[in-house]
Amino acid sequence: MYKLDLVSDPRELAAIEARRNREKERQSRFFNVRNRVMGVDVEALNYQVEERKFREAIERNKDIAYGTKHAHYDLVAQMLEKEEAERAYRLSKRVQDFREQRQQQYKNGHEFDFWDPDQFQEFRVPYYEKDAYFGPASMQYFFGEDLERASHVRMQQEQMRYNLEKQLQEQQAAREEEARAALLSDQLRLAADTRAAELARLEESCRAAMRTAMANANKAQAAKQALQQRREQQRQQEANLTEVKKQVTSDLLTENPQVAQRANAPHRVLPYCWKGMSAEQRAAIRKTQETQRQEKKEQRQAEKLVEAEWGRQNKRLAEAALELEEQERELCAEFRRGLGSFNRELAKEQQAQQNYLNSVIYTNQPTAHYYLQFNTSSR
């Protein structure tokens, strides 16, 4: 036969390698003193570490997302603030433009400030020709000169008259408003006072009616109670008279001895009607008492005899117990002596056996090669 190198089956090789790896893992798990003695679960610890790392990664992602969102919100807020500032600027600019462009037409009206000394500095003052313009060297106008002072004074007077009339009208309207408010307040106060007086009158009338009704009810209740008291007193007097009459004619005060006897039980008496015992009854009771004393005396003597007998019996039992204790002590001492001799013999035999083991059996000491043959496999 020829020696041929046959190709092994890959699945068989994979199975052999898997068994070899499992055996190595099993040996590492069994021969690891830390895992075997302390019981540390490495897989559980690794799982906990991975879980903690995963949780920390999730928290970091949350923090990053929160920071990104916060930055986005800040940017949006800044944009909104900028837009609001621009809107306010445009609004103020439009207001200013409106004032400059549209409110110049009121310079010749009542709203024009006639007391402004610089209001005519920007106008050209023609003297001879209406449309001609002369410079300062022409000496046609001077700084601070008012060529239309009369018209300006008239306009100022009209403005003052208008302002005065307006102030007078406002003051008159304010006085009329105050008068109307005062009149309305007086009317409201008068109505409130009238309403309060009416309510007070109604309350007083209600109180008077309640007092009258309460007084009538109290009178009726008092009359009813007086009638009940008179009837109760009359009934009590009648009951007292009946009780006195019954006591006077009763067997208790008449001392009738027959009333103490019961009809259905002659040997029994009625305690509340009994007047005492007769001489025969007292003699019978004394005789019975004497008999009872004699019986009691005999009973005490018999009890004394029984107690004396019990005392003697207890004494004999105590003596027997002392004898038994003495015998028990002697037996225990003899047992201890026998046990001591037996233990000495047993110690001698054990010492001889140990000497034999040390001198004959345990002479060969194991070497390192002896210990290496153990724990070579996990099976």
UniProtKB/Swiss-Prot annotation:
Q: Which residues form a coiled coil?
A: 154-252, 283-335
Residue spans crossing the bilayer: none
- Which GO cellular component terms are attached? axonemal A tubule inner sheath; sperm flagellum
Might you name a Gene Ontology BP term for this protein? flagellated sperm motility
Q: What Pfam families does its record include?
A: RIB43A (PF05914)
Compartments in which it is found: Cytoplasm, Cytoskeleton, Flagellum axoneme
Keywords from UniProt, A to Z, are:
Cell projection, Cilium, Coiled coil, Cytoplasm, Cytoskeleton, Flagellum
Q: Kindly report the protein's main subcellular placement as a broad class.
A: cytoplasm
- As given in the record, the signal peptide range reads none
Answer yes or no on keyword Cell wall biogenesis/degradation: no
For this chain, the family text in UniProt reads: Belongs to the RIB43A family.
Complex formation: Microtubule inner protein component of sperm flagellar doublet microtubules.
Task: State the name under which the record lists this protein.
Answer: RIB43A-like with coiled-coils protein 1
